[in-house]
Amino acid sequence: MKLKDQIAVVTGGSRGIGYAAVRAFLKEGAEVVLCASRSETAERAVSQLKAELPEARVWGIWPSLEDPEQVRTAFDRIGAEHGRIDILVNNAGVSESTPFGAYTGELFDRVMDLNVKGMFHCARGAVPWMERQGRGVILNTSSMVSFYGQPAGVAYPVSKFAVNGFTLSLARELAPKGIRVNAVAPGIIETDMLRAVPREVLAPLEAQIPLGRVGQPGEVAEAFVFLASEQASYITGVVLRVDGLARA
């Protein structure tokens, strides 16, 4: 098992890519704290995982990631209960597609608060524990739109571009302390959000992917597993694209 007895925290872990990451980490022997936005979604995800993987060591929490005090308290509790924090997966985020003419400052702030500041708060919560043990891994979820933009919802690609910069800067600062920081930039992935897209809209998008299909959450999760494992012990400051060579 690649992550045996590692203590991992996964935000946005109740569905989609985050849920797949939690599941993959559990199968590799990690103990996982699953963060979700609401208690019912966290508890439902934990129940589903334990039903599928009876030996799974997984717990759910639901702090508001925009609230630095709630995040600090949550990470202090995790560290105190488990003795350490080995892996942080910053996956929580929000996407939207409002045309620029209808954009408001409040909407822009909402996207940035969760996608960027929430990630910052979580890293601040985890890093002190990692520094104490002289090692740790932080993995951030970016997106292919951080490289190419998108025609609406301007705050989302801006936020993911910021994620890339945060990843590279934090990697440089924390490398001497034994903490690796990387990001994964998924392309078009088959999540609940994508399944709601009409087929006539999705088909042209698929046609732009050289591999000829959309990706699966489990494929992104395996990238997280690799980057969290000792197999990636000399990799830091990388934004790994998992997009089938899609280019918007």
Task: Annotate the PLM regions.
Residues 2, 120, 135, 213-242, ...:
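C-terminal substrate-recognition "lid" of short-chain dehydrogenase/reductases
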Residues 143:
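Residue(s) in the substrate-gating loop at a strand-loop-helix junction
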Residues 123, 159, 167:
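Active-site helix of classical SDR
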Residues 89, 175, 180, 235-237:
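Short, small/polar-rich loop/turn modules that mediate ligand/substrate recognition or access, typified
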Residues 128, 172-176, 233:
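Alpha-helical segment proximal to the catalytic Tyr-Lys
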